[in-house]
Amino acid sequence: MNYKPRTKVIAGNWKMYKCKDEALEFIQKVSLQVPDQTQVQTLIFPQLTLLDSLAQLQGTNLQVGAQNMFYESEGAFTGEVSPQNLLSLGVKHVLLGHSERRTFFGETDQTVNLKLLSALKHKLVPTVCVGESLLTKENNQTQVFLDQQLTNIFAGVPEEALQNIIIAYEPVWAIGTGKSATPQDANKVIEQIRDKVTALYSSQASCAMRIIYGGSVSVANIKTILEQPAIDGILAGKASLQTEDFLFFAQIASKQALASTKDIFQKNDCPFCC
């Protein structure tokens, strides 16, 4: 099986912010300035109503994804959006299992698993969110919780699909709170996530899979976060709403990607070794 090197990911989850005009202005500005996708993959997840307009403007250096989708291709599911509908708009990425979907809309690991399998079936690229609550963290059960969450979510997912899946580690206690795991702590947890994927599949497959961090990412901490060896990028929330901040994230990632590439060639290392 052939695996691609891990490209850094800078993703922005706009949640329920931005109307059409300001969203179009953002995409028009950013798409002209973000780094080449061979260095950094840049993604924006806007509201559903913006997908049609924004997907038409996305370029090779900036892509647009949906914040959610249903697991059935069509049917009487009022208020939902199908994977086929996303594809018809030119959307190739989808965010699954965000903590706010779980908290406010009752999504479970089993629901996310069905959506993940459906996304893969329809050739969409899923970014799958996992993360623990504050109580779980305080009880020192983070690894146990995440191990079970990953087992549930990846049930039935074939190994060859892993390099087309992004995992976003977003500790629930750090979402929209201003609190953030230290970069070193986030790095440790992401190493544990990769170890679990290795246990479920293989070390080669897990090392080819990108795992990013989300949780109160900011201009102040982005550089330190991306310097962590296990972290392949970020999923930013409100911090991704400002053009300058999003471009700053992408530029930092690009600089680090270029530096890492130089080190790889000097050391003759495997480009996706953990």
From Swiss-Prot:
Summary of subunit composition and partner proteins: Homodimer.
Stated family: Belongs to the triosephosphate isomerase family.
Keywords assigned by UniProt, alphabetized: Cytoplasm, Gluconeogenesis, Glycolysis, Isomerase
Top-level EC class: isomerase
Record-annotated active site: 98, 170
Catalytic activity: D-glyceraldehyde 3-phosphate = dihydroxyacetone phosphate
Coiled-coil segments: none
UniProt protein name: Triosephosphate isomerase
Keyword Cytoplasm: yes
Binding site for substrate: 13-15, 176, 216
InterPro entries: Aldolase_TIM, TIM_sf, TrioseP_Isoase_bac/euk, Triosephosphate_isomerase, Triosephosphate_isomerase_AS
Gene3D superfamilies: Aldolase class I
Cellular compartments annotated: Cytoplasm
Gene that encodes the chain: tpiA
GO biological process, any: glycolytic process
GO cellular component: cytosol
EC number: 5.3.1.1
Pathway(s) the chain acts in: Carbohydrate biosynthesis; gluconeogenesis; Carbohydrate degradation; glycolysis; D-glyceraldehyde 3-phosphate from glycerone phosphate: step 1/1
Protein task: Involved in the gluconeogenesis. Catalyzes stereospecifically the conversion of dihydroxyacetone phosphate (DHAP) to D-glyceraldehyde-3-phosphate (G3P).
